[in-house]
Each structure stands twice: as C-alpha cells, then as structure tokens.
Amino acid sequence: AIDGEGRNAVMLACAADNVSPALIRRLLDLQVPADSVDAHGRRAVDVAAEAGRWAIVQLLDPAYPLPAAVSDGHGDTPGVAVLPDRPPLVLLREGLQFGQRDGLVALARLCAPEELGGLLHDAHLALNAEAVDWLLRHGADADVRDACGDVPMFALLSRGVEAVPALQALLRHGVSPAGAGGLTRLLSACVQHDAASRGLEQLALELLERGADPFAPSAAGDPPLSLAVRLGWLRLQQWLLEHGVDREARDSHGMTALHLATALGRDASLKLLVKQGASPEARAADGQTPLGVALSIGRRDLADWLDWRIWSLPRRTLREADVPAAAMTGDTDAVRRLIDLGLPVDAVDAQGCTALLRAAGGGHLGVVAHLLNRGADPQRAANSGATPLSAAVSMRQTEIVAALLQAGAQIEHRLPGGVTVLMLACALGLPDIVARLLTAAADVHATDNQELAPLHCAALYGFTARDKNRLLALLDTLLLAGADPEHLAGGRVSPLLLLLGARAEPGTACDEQVVLAGVERLLDEEVSLDVADQRGFGPLHLAALHGLPLLVQRLLRAGADADRRDALNRTPREIAIMRGFIDVAGQFEPALPGVSLMARFLREGR
C-alpha cells in the first residue's frame, strides 16, 4: 500500500522523527518492499540517508556506501544497530574541517543548497579557502544570510586581510560583491588592522570591477575615498574619483579626503585630489581648510599645492585647457603646478592656443620663460595660424620676442596670407622689434601672397601713423637692411604709393607731416615717381585724392608729372576738384598776383 505521493510503509517509517532499526526490520520481514520509489524518484534508503540514519541505511541496502566518519569509527563492531544517527550536513562539516574529502560528494548530494550555503558562515570553514571552493563547486548557495543578515561575501569583507583567500575563492566562482557598503567593510577592516598591502588594493579594485558599491560610507560614517586615503591606495583613489564619488564627502570626523591627505602628509594623494577637483577651500568641522592644516603641521611643500591665489581651481577635474587659461592670467606658479600634475605643457584650449601662445600674447615673460624651460614648443600654431612669436609681436612684447627667438622660434614661419612676423612688426610700426628680427636674420625681401614685402607693410603703417620719429626709424631700419624701395607688389603698388594711401579709402584720416617725412626718406633713396597702381593713380593722384597740399608741392618739386592721367583719363588736379580740395587743385597752376585760389578756381570753372 502507498499514499498519495507513492510512499509505502518503509519509506514513511524512514521519514519519521523517531524510528528504530527493529521497526524497519519488522516491516521488511512483512515483505514491505524497500526498493520502491515515491513520486519524486526517491527510495527508502535515500530518505534514511538524508536523515543521517546510517543503521537503517545499512539495513535497507548493505551495499550503500557509508561516510568514512561512520564506517571507520564502527567498522569492527558487529551488527548494524550500533551505527550512529548523524546528519549528512554534520558529517560534511567535519570532513571539510579536517580535510577528509572521501565520500563528501555523496554527502553533499544529500544536502540542500541552502544547507551547504550555511556552511559558508561556519566559524571553522568560512576562512578556509579550500573548503569554500569545495562547497561552491558542489552547489552551495552563496546568498544564504547569517544571524546578522549578511551574505558570506559581506561577512568575509568585514574580516579584512584574514579573509582574502576565501574572498578570492568566492570571486572565482562568480559571487557578486554588489550591495551597499561592501567595499567600505573591507577598507574599514584594513584600516583597523593597519593592513595596506598592494595585494589588498588590487583586491579592492577587483571588487569594484565586479560591482562593489563605491559610494556608501562605512557603518562609522567614513566614505570609501577617505578610507582609501588613510590606506594610501592611490590606484583605488583614482578609480573612485574617476567614477564620480563625492570629492568633498566628510568622514566621521568632519574632514574631507583632502584634509586627510594633508594631515597624513600623503603628497601623492593630495596631488591626485587637487587634479580631480577637490577644493582646498573646504572647511572641516573645526573650520580649518586643507591649506591651514598644511601650515599648522609645518608642511610648506604641501601648502604650495593648496595655495591658488591668482588662477583659482575650477572645482572640477582639471583639463588640458586649464594650462592655457592659467597662462593667460600670468600665474607662473599655477602653470608650474598644472604641468607637475601631468597636464601637457603644449596643451591647447578651444581656439587651439597653447599656454606659451597665451602667455606671449599677454606679456607674461615669467610664464613664457618657465614654459620654455619645461620644453614648450615655440612653433605650435593656433587654429587661426597665430604662433607664440606672432602673438608677442602683435602685443609689442620685445623681451618675449627675444626669448622666443633664443628658444628657436622659426622667424620665417608663414602666417595666414603668407605673412611673416617681420611684415607684421612693420605693419604695426614697431622699429625696435623689426631691428631685433632683422638681427636674427629675418628676410627683408620676403613677400606675402600679395607680393607685399616688409617695406610695403611699413608704408601701409606710415599713411595712418602719428609718430614721425617711429616711422622714420622703421623706414631707416628696413632700408639699411637692404629693402628694395622700388619693388612693386601685387596691383603694381610701390612703397611710395602705399605711403601715399594707395590702399586707403578716400577720407581716411592721416597726419600730413608724418607722411611727408616718410616720403622725404623714400625720395632720398631716389625712388621713381613714374609709378601707378591698377587705377592708374600715380603719386600726385594719391596726394590729391587724400587732400594733401604739402605733399603735392613736394612731389611737384621732385619732378612728378602733373599731367599724368589715370585709367579714367583724369589728371591729379581733376581728382582734387572732384574731391572738393580747392586748395590742393590750386597747387597745380602757377600763382597769379592778387588772385586767390578760390577766385582762380571759380574763373576757370566758367
């Protein structure tokens, strides 16, 4: 007879709480079959084995393999009644504890995964890496919780260095360290036991890669970053910072990680935190800043990394573009620190400008000197094509120009349009810089894409110049260096024509005395007056166009042709009349006694 689950009397007896071998023997004598199976495919002997009733097991199946702990201890005792009733889990625990592996696989099959998982919390097995490995290989449930509500992984993390082999066994079997506060359990235990080996740091990193929580603080309120600083684990600190932990999180004493790094004298941690955006101005519970902590312990070397007076830290992870930004402010110390933190000396900003270019353009000689000493490239151009040398020339920084030339800046580097720095200096009217560039072997005959030479650029400057001495010094410097005063640029313009305003719009303001002085200097070079631009404008046409009577007189005395006609068949006098310069037009006719210029103009107009 069987019940609804297919169990007969022998099977039910084996599953009962208290049953003696004599009862089982009596049932067998009554021909109750012992080898029938229930609805789950189990035999009576399997039920007895699961309950640890080894005397009944031997009675039901003498060939059933008994655990070594049972058979070895009672192998010489006759009869089956003396075999003890010991649950498989107990026998399994003892076998693992004493390293006796024979027969344990069969015992493991008699235990539920939850029961095997409970052994992972056993005081004698939890730290035994081999036992942990064996249990996991045979189906132990790694999510079973102990009396404190911890899974085996978290229980081991709380034990620190002594649990490392067992933790590694769990990780090898894919047990996840995920869950709030797992990492800080390990870090807190390491801090408590003063265990800060690199192997432990590597384990912490492996835990993070496998999903450990990098954010939750410890039970005492210490965040992972602060604990990592205490342990001096730089790689762990960097991992945490790069993955977004709070840089300003306070520990149980109200201190940030930067406070701790300063107080402990950990300069590498301090630099890392500064680079990752930690604030030197954060205040601890007692009101002190990291800078104050450094000064109070006499560590001025650390204080240097915390004192950003001119260029302030941006309260974020430092970027390469911060180097040019600091250079723009002229903060040499900030630039030095940024480079020492690993940022490239030739880092560029959004405009492609390097720190050297920004410092050169800003006139910060100290920053320029430091950058050059650190190996900055003096030729690195911005997106616009500007170089540090062109920036220094543009901003009239003579000393910086000299420093860049000494550092090897290419003096003939072409800017957009084929312009050289010598042309740029001439166009800006900088005789001192022009002289320095020529001394450094700048090519006075070089031309740009419009075939303009440096002397042409100086002439362009001269038309709107206000300083006669500067213009004359500029022209003297170029002419003494061998510049050709007769060279015709694109559009057939000579330096003389440009000096007279060939490229200027009519009505452009100019100082006639300054232009006259420049023309006199070119006339000293016996420049040709028989030149004209594409419009057919000669020197007198241009002087008339801009209303320059003194220049008209001087050009006429020098032999300029007053009857020369432009491309529209106009004489210089007609140009002056068209522009309304009556006094200028009068310069082209011989003076009549007693007749004013205006009267003569009105008479001739009839």
What is each model feature region?
Residues 3, 38, 72, 146, ...:
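Ankyrin repeat boundary/linker residues
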Residues 6, 41, 75, 88, ...:
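Start-of-repeat signature of ankyrin repeats
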Residues 17-19, 52, 99, 127, ...:
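Ankyrin-repeat intra-repeat helix-capping/turn positions
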Residues 19, 23, 55-56, 103, ...:
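Conserved ankyrin/ankyrin-like repeat signature
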Residues 25-33, 59-65, 105-112, 133-141, ...:
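Ankyrin repeat domain, specifically the short helix-to-loop turn at the C-terminus of the second helix
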Residues 50, 54-98, 103-106, 110-114, ...:
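Ankyrin-repeat-protein effector appendages
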Residues 122-126, 147-150, 154-158, 164-171, ...:
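Core solenoid repeat modules with strong leucine/isoleucine-rich periodicity
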